[in-house]
């Protein structure tokens, strides 16, 4: 059950990350929404745990 929740969580963050890529390049931090940046940071932490 926990694995399913983690998988769903990572998929959601991946989708959010793809939208942030469309709105602006990753290097332009001024245009990144703080919530999207927070989600990307969580996604990086999730990848490190695996």
From Swiss-Prot:
Localization (cell): Secreted
Described purpose of this protein according to its UniProt entry: Amphipathic peptide which probably adopts an alpha-helical structure. Has no antimicrobial activity against E.coli DH5alpha or B.thuringiensis. Is not cytotoxic in vitro.
Protein name (record): Ampulexin 2
Assembly and binders: Dimer; disulfide-linked.
Tissue expression from the record: Expressed in venom sac and, to a lesser extent, in venom gland. Not expressed in brain.
Signal sequence interval, chain numbering: 1-26
Gene Ontology CC terms, in alphabetical order: extracellular region
Principal subcellular localisation of the protein: secreted
Keyword annotations of the record: Disulfide bond, Secreted, Signal
């Amino acid at each position: 059950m926990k694995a399913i929740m983690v998988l769903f969580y990572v998929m959601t963050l991946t989708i959010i990350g793809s939208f942030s890529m469309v709105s602006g390049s990753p290097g332009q931090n001024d245009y990144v929404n703080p919530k999207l940046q927070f989600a990307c940071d969580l996604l990086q932490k999730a990848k490190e745990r695996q």
